[in-house]
Swiss-Prot record:
InterPro entries in alphabetical order: Luc7-rel
Family (UniProt): Belongs to the Luc7 family.
Positions of region (Disordered): 235-392
GO CC entries: nuclear speck; U1 snRNP; U2-type prespliceosome
GO annotation, biological process: mRNA splice site recognition
GN (gene name): LUC7L2
Subcellular location: Nucleus speckle; Nucleus, Nucleoplasm
Keywords: Coiled coil, Hydroxylation, Nucleus, Phosphoprotein
Residues annotated with Phosphoserine modification: 18
Name of the protein in question: Putative RNA-binding protein Luc7-like 2
Coiled coil: 102-177
Length: 392
């Protein structure tokens, strides 16, 4: 891979599919079935074992670092449960590896049938010491690369002790079996990666195996599988607890409803009294509203009636004043008429005393009578007009 391709892959891993605004790369999402879920969780065997003796080639599903970055961002807000798919994938792969290991062990067992159990135990002891030495040497290399010289020196001391034990175990094993069969019993199977190991391999070769990419890759896959099992078990336990909690809540609600229905059926009077109180409170509130409305209406009516009564009283006072003025005028007129009448009567008496003295007096008397009759009719007309004005 060129430096440019490496930089592009690093940017995809950091920023996702939309780092350059390229919409064509967003046609497939990380949740698509075509995407490898083990790759999203960084545990696909095709990636881990690439470049080793057991290279599996390219995965049948899509591998994209940008999709992994998208998944890591989205998984912080939502759980997609991709651990189940990855766990199934790794379980099938490890099962195949364990099956190959068992087959290799059976093949070796067929060639070693004539070896006694005691000799097999001695050979197993030599194999164990070889594995221990190889792991210690791999650890020494790792510590030396990190610059931890003191720790690496301590581990080298342990390596020397293990080598001494190995030499003793090889000597015991060599003396316990004939030379012809000793050369045949030089292989064993690695329990981790199912690779064959020589019984008489030197320390350098054993260190290369136990510190190699193949062996470490299988260790990584097995550790990742155990981690996924633990995560899946925790999530399933959490989900079961949530389901149990929801079920308990539903059962509690059902029991509460049943208890309420039973209480209503047992105590109908109480329910009726409650309904009666509710109805009574509602009616009282309605009555209060009606009273407030009626009070407001009465206030408005009183205000209007007061204003109308004030206007009526004013008009009545005006009419009273006008009627008083009219009555005063009438009384004045009547008093004047009575004076005139008295004067006329006095004159009539004088005329009677001197009755028929002259024709001039007769004419004067007739004029007075006609004048009095005219005054009487005009007085009646005025009184009727005044009466009508008073009624108005």
């Amino acid at each position: 891979m060129s430096a440019q391709a490496q930089m592009r892959a690093m940017l995809d891993q950091l920023m996702g599919t939309s780092r350059d605004g390229d919409t064509t790369r967003q046609r497939i999402k990380f949740s698509d079935d075509r995407v490898c879920k083990s790759h999203l969780l960084n545990c696909c065997p095709h990636d881990v074992l690439s470049g080793t003796r057991m290279d599996l080639g390219e995965c049948l599903k899509v591998h994209d670092l940008a999709l992994r970055a998208d998944y890591e961002i989205a998984s912080k807000e939502q759980d997609f449960f991709f651990e189940l798919d990855a766990m199934d994938h790794l379980q099938s792969f490890i099962a195949d590896c364990d099956r190959r290991t068992e087959v290799a062990k059976k093949r070796l067992a067929e060639t070693q049938e004539e070896i006694s159990a005691e000799v097999a135990a001695k050979a197993e002891r030599v194999h164990e010491l070889n594995e221990e030495i190889g792991k210690l040497l791999a650890k020494v290399e790792q510590l030396g690369a990190e610059g931890n010289v003191e720790e690496s020196q301590k581990v080298m001391d342990e390596v020397e002790k293990a080598r001494a034990k190995k030499r003793e175990a090889e000597e015991v094993y060599r003396n316990s079996m004939p030379a012809s069969s000793f050369q045949q019993q030089k292989l064993r199977v690695c329990e981790v990666c199912s690779a064959y190991l020589g019984l008489h391999d030197n320390d350098r070769r054993l260190a290369d195996h136990f510190g190699g990419k193949l062996h470490l890759g299988f260790i990584e896959i097995r550790e990742k599988l155990e981690e996924l099992k633990r995560v899946v078990a925790e999530k399933q336990e959490k989900r079961n607890q949530e389901r149990l909690k929801r079920r308990e809540e539903r059962e509690r609600e059902e029991r509460e409803k049943l208890r309420r229905s039973r209480s209503h059926s047992k105590n109908p009077k109480r329910s009726r009294s409650r309904e009666h109180r509710r109805h009574r409170s509602r009616s009282m509130s309605r009555e209060r509203k009606r009273r407030t409305r009626s009070k407001s209406r009465e206030k408005r009516h009183r205000h209007r009636s007061r204003s109308s009564s004030r206007s009526r009283s004013r008009s009545h006072q005006r009419s009273r004043h006008s009627s008083r003025d009219r009555s005063r005028e009438r009384s004045k007129r009547r008093s004047s008429k009575e004076r005139f009448r008295d004067q006329d009567l006095a004159s009539c008496d004088r005329d009677r005393s001197s009755r028929d003295r002259s024709p001039r007096d007769r004419d004067r008397k007739d004029k007075k009578r006609s004048y009095e009759s005219a005054n009487g009719r005009s007085e009646d007309r005025r009184s009727s007009e005044e009466r009508e004005a008073g009624e108005i």
